[in-house]
């Protein structure tokens, strides 16, 4: 995945209003034509990073999806100034993205391990993922025993230790079902789907 791109600034806001420019110390939102930043969605926190222009630097503290599908980069103008129409260099924090991706992958390992230990009735009902932690909500009909928790933990840790490559492929929904791919909670799928595999997980 790309971590940098150049794009034109199309909209700037402070916390109260749409503006033509942001100056050092201003808190606000930057909207550009195209971005490499992932927005907060599906329980996963959005990217952090910086947006640079020839005259200033904006620290992105979170990234959100706005009405109409645009992406908002929320943060603080930390140096100089920037204005609508400027060309900006978008830079995602590589460490933040990598750690978030690792925890996102861990939710998939956890789901498979839970289904292996508890049964196929286990389904994801929600999750939260950021670089430091994850939470995974799932269906089950009783509290897990200490032994079940230990088994699930062992399976996930074994798979992490194996350093299994993550392989992605795009295929039709029918082809995905034939491979045994699991659909995720709350997702709506089009004709083509992205399938992620980690070994036999």
Regions found by a protein language model. Name each.
Residues 1-201:
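A glycine- and charged-residue-rich anion-binding loop/surface
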């Amino acid at each position: 995945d790309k971590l940098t791109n150049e794009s034109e600034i199309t909209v700037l806001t402070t916390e109260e209003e749409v503006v033509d420019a942001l100056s050092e110390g201003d808190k606000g939102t930057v909207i550009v034509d195209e971005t490499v930043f992932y927005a907060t969605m599906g329980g996963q926190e959005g990217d952090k990073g910086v947006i640079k222009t020839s005259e200033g630097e904006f620290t992105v503290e979170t990234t959100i999806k706005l009405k109409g599908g645009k992406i908002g980069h929320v943060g603080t103008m930390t140096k100089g100034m920037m204005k609508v129409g400027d060309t900006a260099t978008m830079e995602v924090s590589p460490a933040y993205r990598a750690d978030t991706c690792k925890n996102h992958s861990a939710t998939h390992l956890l789901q498979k391990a839970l289904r292996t230990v508890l049964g196929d009735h286990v389904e994801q009902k929600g999750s939260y993922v950021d670089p430091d932690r994850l939470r995974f909500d799932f269906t089950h009909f009783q509290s897990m025993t200490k032994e079940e928790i230990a088994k699930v933990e062992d399976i996930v840790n074994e798979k992490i230790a194996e350093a299994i490559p993550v392989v992605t492929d795009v295929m039709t929904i029918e082809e995905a079902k034939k491979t045994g791919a699991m659909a995720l909670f709350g997702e709506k799928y089009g004709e083509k789907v992205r399938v992620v595999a980690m070994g036999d997980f």
